[in-house]
Amino acid sequence: MAQSNQHVSIYNPKVIVYSIGLTTAILASMSIYRSHFVRFSTSLDVPKTLFRTKHLHGKVTSVGDGDNFHFYHLPGGIFAGWGWIRETPEINKFRKLKNKTIHVRLCGVDAPERSHFGKPSQPYSEEALQWLRQFILGKKVKVKPLSVDQYNRIVGRVFIFRWNGWNDVSEEMLRNGVAIVYENKSSAEFDGMKERYLKVENKAKKKKKGLWGIERGLTPGEYKRLYK
């Protein structure tokens, strides 16, 4: 019996449909990989297309001030093997993690300034630092990047998962009186939360929580302008 030697043209509708389907699947896979499995080492590595639309998941590796921290990006979470196949980094390993972490500035809040370059520290600055360390250091958080500031830090809205769900870290700082609502109107990032933050801050004031329970001095914004 003679074998068929029919040639299937690349213009055959079935071939075209198959090619389109395969190409679409490949492009979708690449997009998912870039969005969920590519690790970003520093703030400058994060694509602008992810700002305000996506969350970066990872681990807080150090907290050096009352309103910012370093964060090791763990894309894909446990599905990418982090914590069981791939090791997550230890905390406070500064040399080992140099150029491997994203510096994050919490949006919408300002904590009392610590002593830097011979400048005096503000009252309650150490308490604010210790509160933030206790709350997030060594823990998994998610960061919604909003912008990059003059120090190449990602200004972001940060969430930590607790017994009652995802908690906004900036809001929790205001609730506990360890930070105030950010005052610089021209460069402030709030992700639409300013009015809520002001309400939470006002409640903390009335209850004299944290820094509201001590004698008032300069606000963090006033302090920075004074020692600029």
From Swiss-Prot:
PROSITE patterns: TNASE_3. This is Probable endonuclease LCL3. Pfam families: SNase. It is a single-pass membrane protein. Keywords: Calcium, Endonuclease, Hydrolase, Membrane, Metal-binding, Mitochondrion, Nuclease, Transmembrane, Transmembrane helix. The gene is LCL3. Its main location: mitochondrion. GO terms for cellular component: membrane; mitochondrion. Its EC number is 3.1.-.-. The lineage of its organism: Eukaryota, Fungi, Dikarya, Ascomycota, Saccharomycotina. The active site is at 105, 113, 153. Residues 54-214 form the TNase-like domain. One of its GO terms (molecular function) is endonuclease activity. The chain crosses the membrane at residues 15-37. Ca(2+) binds at residue 110.
